[in-house]
Each structure stands twice: as structure tokens, then as C-alpha cells.
């Protein structure tokens, strides 16, 4: 007698399971970032690496720990990766839309006298763009987007829908920096070094201001991720990388040897950052409306 095999549709994820996976995404990133920042300098000292090489060691640790871990838990296309062609188009879209928004708002701020551009060294600027892109991509953009706008986002969206996923992903994102400092401090103590700063915000920054900016940044990255139907995570990665680059040129140009010196003529100049993030988010929402007409479904 022939046996009949009835296929049952996969059961929907439980609320607890979805929240657990979402938190796991944040935990993976926090541990990877903490280990990279803590173990990177130790390995650099052992190998005698300095400068860019030392920074790349720390950055590579973060990516090597975070990205393969997530891809063992979920399929690459599920978290938002795609074919090489689609990935490149999505990445360039993220970079292009974000750069355009930043130029528009920062240009307006310059015209209003909020920013004064005093010095431009093209050779130094190009060098900064190359080195900053390599380090920021491995240290932050790729691993953070894979764990958070990738694994955390898809875990929450699949169970709760878009709006709760936006709030949940943003909340988890805001927990990562502080949690990572605990991991870094623990590794530093084991190595006999100064544990350094522990806190929810980088040393010298007001915690509330930092968390508000982080929340706006998260919403912009989610808008980028939701804007495209194919390889959408790469749009968020491109956006993340471009925001880090623009902010470092505008706010930390001299300290980071960017080749550009920017004077903030008014305390209100810092508001240009959240403003251009909002402009970029709106642009991605408009892009989403267009792509949804041509691409069925949504990642």
C-alpha cells in the first residue's frame, strides 16, 4: 500500500522565540564588537602592528565573529543578502541616496553660515576615504547590519509585522554600544590593561543626545533596508558606511586626519546630522513606494 505523506506548513514562530532571536542578534554584535575592541589592541601589540594594520585587526575580528555566526543561524537571503549584481546595485543606492541627502543638508548649513570649510587636502582626503571605508566596513557597517537590520529585523518582522519590528530593532540597536563596553572592559582586565570607559554613550558625549541620535540613525537604516526588494541589506550597509564617513569629516575632520577642516560656527550645527538622516530616511521611503510597484513582496 502506498503511504500518503501530508506536508504541513511550517508553524509560525512564537513570540518568545522571535524576541529571543532578536536579542541574540544584538548579543552577537555586542560580544563581537567588545572582543574586537578589547582583543584587537592585544593582538596588535603581539604582532607589532600599528596604525591602519592595528585598526584592521580589531575590525576583522568583529566581522569574522559576527557575520558567519548569523549566517549559521539564518540563510543569507533571509537576512537580506542577494546576488552579486543585486548586492552592488543596492549598496550603490544606499551610498548614493545617503551622500545626496548629506550634501543637500550640509550644503544648506554651509550656506546659512553654520559650517565653515577652512581647508581641503585632496590627497589626504582620498587616503582617509580608503582607510576609513576599510575599517568602518569591517568594524561597524557589515557586522551591525547583518546582526541587527538583518537577523534581528527579520526575526521580529516575521512574527510581529513591520511597526513592532522597527521599534524592537531600534531598541536592540541602542543596547549594543553599552553592552560592548562591558565585554571590552572584561577582556582588558584579563590582559592586565586599563578597562577604559564603560557606558551607554562614548566618553565625552551626553547619553541622552547620543541615544536620540542612535534612534534616528536606526530608523534611517531600517528605511534603507526596506526600500529595495533585492539584496536590501546592502542598501543599509551602504547607508551606514556613508553616514559614518560624512559624520567623521564634518565632526572629527582634524582629529581623524581627513584632509578637511570644518569649523562649526554655531552650536546648532550639530543638528544638521539628525536633519540629514531624516531627509535620507524620507528619500528611502519614497524609493520604497516606487520599488513596491515593480517588485512583488518585500524583504
Q: Could you tell me what each predicted segment is?
A:
Residues 1-88, 103-106, 190-192, 225-227, ...:
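N-terminal, membrane-interfacial amphipathic/helix-forming hydrophobic leader that caps
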Residues 5, 44-52, 76-146, 153-159, ...:
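Juxtamembrane helix-loop-helix connectors linking adjacent transmembrane helices
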Residues 23-27, 91-96, 130-143, 163-168, 201-217, 271-278, ...:
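Hydrophobic alpha-helical transmembrane segments
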Residues 27-31, 95-108, 136-140, 165-179, ...:
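Alpha-helical transmembrane segments of multi-pass integral membrane proteins
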Residues 46-58, 160-172, 205, 231-235, ...:
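Membrane-interface starts of transmembrane alpha-helices
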Residues 143-170, 174-175, 226-231:
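Membrane-interface helix/loop boundary segments of multi-pass membrane proteins
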Residues 170, 194-265:
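Functionally important transmembrane alpha-helices
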Amino acid at each position: 500500500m502506498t503511504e500518503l505523506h501530508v506536508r504541513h506548513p511550517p508553524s509560525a514562530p512564537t513570540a518568545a522565540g522571535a524576541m529571543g532571536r532578536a536579542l541574540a542578534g544584538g548579543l552577537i554584535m555586542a560580544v563581537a564588537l567588545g572582543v574586537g575592541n578589547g582583543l584587537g589592541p592585544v593582538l596588535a601589540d603581539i604582532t607589532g602592528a600599528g596604525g591602519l594594520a592595528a585598526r584592521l585587526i580589531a575590525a576583522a575580528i568583529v566581522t569574522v565573529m559576527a557575520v558567519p555566526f548569523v549566517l549559521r543561524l539564518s540563510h543569507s537571503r533571509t537576512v537580506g543578502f542577494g546576488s552579486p549584481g543585486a548586492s552592488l546595485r543596492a549598496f550603490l543606492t544606499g551610498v548614493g541616496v545617503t551622500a545626496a541627502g548629506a550634501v543637500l543638508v550640509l550644503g544648506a548649513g554651509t550656506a546659512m553660515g553654520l559650517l565653515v570649510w577652512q581647508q581641503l587636502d585632496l590627497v589626504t582626503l582620498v587616503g582617509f576615504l580608503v582607510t576609513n571605508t576599510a575599517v568602518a566596513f569591517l568594524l561597524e557597517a557589515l557586522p551591525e547590519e547583518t546582526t541587527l537590520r538583518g537577523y534581528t529585523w527579520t526575526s521580529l518582522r516575521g512574527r510581529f509585522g513591520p511597526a513592532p519590528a522597527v521599534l524592537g530593532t531600534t531598541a536592540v540597536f541602542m543596547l549594543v554600544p553599552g553592552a560592548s563596553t562591558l565585554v571590552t572592559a572584561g577582556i582588558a582586565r584579563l590582559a592586565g590593561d586599563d578597562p577604559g570607559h564603560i557606558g551607554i554613550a562614548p566618553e565625552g558625549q551626553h547619553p541622552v543626545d547620543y541615544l536620540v541620535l542612535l534612534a534616528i540613525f536606526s530608523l534611517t537604516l531600517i528605511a534603507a533596508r526596506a526600500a529595495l526588494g533585492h539584496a536590501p541589506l546592502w542598501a543599509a550597509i551602504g547607508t551606514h558606511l556613508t553616514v559614518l564617513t560624512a559624520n567623521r569629516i564634518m565632526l572629527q575632520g582634524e582629529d581623524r586626519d581627513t584632509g578637511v577642516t570644518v569649523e562649526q560656527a554655531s552650536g546648532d550645527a550639530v543638528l544638521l546630522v539628525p536633519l540629514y538622516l531624516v531627509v535620507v530616511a524620507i528619500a528611502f521611503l519614497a524609493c520604497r513606494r516606487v520599488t513596491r510597484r515593480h517588485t512583488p513582496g518585500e524583504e
